[in-house]
Amino acid sequence: VCTVEHLMASLHMAGITNVLAKVDEEIPNVDGSAKDFSELIKEAGVEDQGVSAKEAVVLAPIQVGRKKLAEKHLYVEPFEGFEVKMRIDYSAPIGEQELTYNFAHDSFDIDIAPARSFNTFENIDLAQKTGTVGSGYLDSHIILHDGKVINTDLRFPDEFIRHKILDLIGDLYLLGYPLRGRVVANMTSHGYNQALVQKLHVALTT
């Protein structure tokens, strides 16, 4: 099943630990954000099943990659609550951005869920020519070309890093438990996020 991370991020931040999702081979990408999923979950409501949910409690730092500013890396460390600190640095119009999302103090539905996927026109054009994405891809991404956003207005000045945090939160849902810890990420992608989940799973089961 493809494009699951936005739905998983909404489920994660809604505190849902027991859910059955019936889907086709791909989750609808809608507008490239998690906004619609979060709104539908809120509209449907969440049932308290009367059983305390287990937590994945980080007791010691776990790391993927080397802690160097110029290299992709991320790590998780003990923290009372859930927090994500992210840094990205891409060519214009994105540049260097840093942002912290704290579950207790920030609103996922307002601050993170509306942030959309982004890609370059060149990457999208190539993918369409090779048939790996359809025309609807253009409506679900912020498209970048020649140092500019060419197809939409940004919802936030730093929408790009907000979406990277959204993706990371969705990938962490693969752990199967709410995470109690702080995740610090530098220029990471799904591969690094999922590698951290695998390391966390090993630490929790050994």
Residue ranges, per PLM feature:
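C-terminal regulatory domains involved in ligand/effector binding and gene-expression control
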Residues: 1-17, 22-206
